[in-house]
C-alpha cells in the first residue's frame, strides 16, 4: 500500500456526538486520491496542459469500521486492486494512529475521462504499464 494522506480530526469536522462526520471522511479520501494518481501516473489536476483527460470517480463504497474522535491522528494508505479497459479500482484504508485501528475503508472505481467528449476512454498501454507496477490483487471480499 502507498501512504497517500495524513490528517487530523479537527473539532470543526466533528458533529454533536463528538465524532468526525461522514462528509469529512469523503473529503479526506478524495484528497488522498490525488496523491495516489500522482504516485501511480505522475498526474496532477494541472498536469494535462491540453486539458484532455482526467480521472473521474464513478463509484464509492465506504465502510465505517471505527469511530474517529476530535484530535485523532489519521493516515490513509491506498492500493490499486484492478485495472480495467477504461477504469481502475482503488482500495483505501483510513487508520487511526492513536489506537492502530482501521477507521474506514473506501473502494473507489475511477474512469479515465475525456474532458472534451465528456465520456470515458480506454486506458492507454502506457498508463496501463505505469499502473501495473502498483497493482495488488485482492480476494473478492475486499
Name every feature range the model reports, one short phrase each.
Residues 1-73, 81-142:
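Terminal targeting signals and extreme-terminal segments of soluble enzymes
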Amino acid at each position: 500500500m502507498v501512504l497517500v494522506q495524513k490528517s487530523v480530526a479537527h473539532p470543526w469536522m466533528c458533529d454533536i456526538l463528538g465524532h468526525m462526520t461522514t462528509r469529512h471522511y469523503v473529503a479526506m479520501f478524495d484528497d488522498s486520491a490525488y496523491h495516489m494518481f500522482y504516485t501511480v501516473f505522475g498526474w496532477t489536476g494541472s498536469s494535462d496542459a491540453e486539458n484532455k483527460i482526467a480521472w473521474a470517480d464513478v463509484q464509492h463504497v465506504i465502510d465505517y469500521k471505527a469511530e474517529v474522535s476530535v484530535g485523532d491522528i489519521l493516515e490513509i494508505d491506498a492500493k490499486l486492486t484492478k485495472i480495467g479497459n477504461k477504469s481502475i479500482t482503488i482500495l483505501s484504508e483510513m487508520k487511526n494512529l492513536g489506537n492502530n485501528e482501521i477507521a474506514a475503508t473506501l473502494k473507489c472505481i475511477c474512469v479515465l475521462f475525456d474532458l472534451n467528449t465528456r465520456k470515458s476512454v480506454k486506458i492507454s498501454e502506457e498508463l496501463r504499464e505505469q499502473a501495473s507496477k502498483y497493482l495488488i490483487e485482492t480476494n473478492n471480499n475486499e
